[in-house]
Swiss-Prot record:
It is a peripheral membrane protein. Heme binds at residue 442. GO terms for molecular function: estrogen 16-alpha-hydroxylase activity; heme binding; iron ion binding; monooxygenase activity; testosterone 6-beta-hydroxylase activity. Catalyzes nifedipine and nilvadipine oxidations. It catalyses: an organic molecule + reduced [NADPH--hemoprotein reductase] + O2 = an alcohol + oxidized [NADPH--hemoprotein reductase] + H2O + H(+). Its EC number is 1.14.14.1. It is an enzyme of class 1 (oxidoreductase). Pfam families: p450 (PF00067). This is Cytochrome P450 3A8. The gene is CYP3A8. It comes from Macaca fascicularis (Crab-eating macaque). The keyword Cytoplasm does not apply. Keywords: Endoplasmic reticulum, Heme, Iron, Membrane, Metal-binding, Microsome, Monooxygenase, Oxidoreductase. Belongs to the cytochrome P450 family. PROSITE patterns: CYTOCHROME_P450.
Amino acid sequence: MDLIPDLAVETWLLLAVTLVLLYLYGTHSHGLFKKLGIPGPTPLPLLGNILSYRKGFWTFDMECYKKYGKVWGFYDGRQPVLAITDPNMIKTVLVKECYSVFTNRRPFGPVGFMKNAISIAEDEEWKRIRSLLSPTFTSGKLKEMVPIIAKYGDVLVRNLRREAETGKPVTLKDVFGAYSMDVITSTSFGVNIDSLNNPQDPFVENTKKLLRFDFLDPFFLSITIFPFIIPILEVLNISIFPREVTSFLRKSVKRIKESRLKDTQKHRVDFLQLMIDSQNSKETESHKALSDLELVAQSIIFIFAGYETTSSVLSFIIYELATHPDVQQKLQEEIDTVLPNKAPPTYDTVLQMEYLDMVVNETLRIFPIAMRLERVCKKDVEINGIFIPKGVVVMIPSYALHHDPKYWPEPEKFLPERFSKKNNDNIDPYIYTPFGSGPRNCIGMRFALMNMKLAIIRVLQNFSFKPCKETQIPLKLRLGGLLQTEKPIVLKIESRDGTVSGA
């Protein structure tokens, strides 16, 4: 049997030329860092270094940091990525040269009308949308939103109490995922859902579809390897955001907005209402007001940015408290002192809790959900003697920096005291970046922190957590794109008035 097909000479020649052209296409940019004298791992044709992500972004970044030092270069497909770890360089990228050179994040695929979402928008459009949304996230507006969040804190306590009464261990992602979903959908769309007990609700179903995201799935990998297909996909109206979901949310926002414009008597302070108000505000005349489609895009991106992150961080916090009972007890004592007799938390009482702040900050150090920060270089520039050509993605490996023993002695240990007032001066704001830094940091940072702290307070007022036989110790992270655990975090829950689950 002849294994080599009997093809004409012209066919073989065409095949050879095609392979050579494909090889040249796939390696054309791969000599950049060598030419600049920047070290880094050897890329493969077409793929670059993306196969290394199979062991986790954070593992790849930490290995490179250890091997190559402060600066290294690698390739996502053909895209050159420059990793920087020097705090002065990081400050230049995120703050000093944000508007002039490093304004934009890396485009990550065809996004359709979502190109106007604050996390994705570029240059002047981003500046306009950021300035229109900034008043929505002030401390005054956040203070008014606390009762909405607190309501779902009570739902969370009810759900946990029911779990405690079953006597079974609790899977944290289930209960905190439901809490996160309830708060985000309520503040972004003004809808009230108890998602744990109403999983068939169309808002719950559509939001969960929106969040099935993995940067290592074949679709994303093909875009990384062949970025020229992105404009073709845009023309074909194909988006990484599922069309049936965005269509449902667009119709929902339209319906809710029309209903609210008719009912002018009710005073609402959720994000949706604040954005509707901004459309009609005379103060926005210096910038074109948000269009209805832009308003929908912001609501969707709030879900996208807030759901997974909040539920994951809450799970990590409770896990650390369960495995460090002394810290859990100390935090409960602070909560009981500031809020005796399970008094409901307020904006001001949350801000009084220093130890709670330390616990949250230390958890975000160990588990920075945004493992990397990225900015695209808009023009040739030199920083700290390093030449960065236009088009290079500059990446700050937050996870690696948060685990660097040079800045954090015994970095794998959970030590909230690192963030005590007396140690604050030792923390470099460009090494510790759980929410990014500079003009393009996370606009929802204060909201996210308040949301998580309110949940922690309500939960610890009523329950204590302990490891059980199903608890994975030490916790292992899942290999892949996002910072998630290999196995769900499962804990025993004890009601502080005596009921025990998972005993």
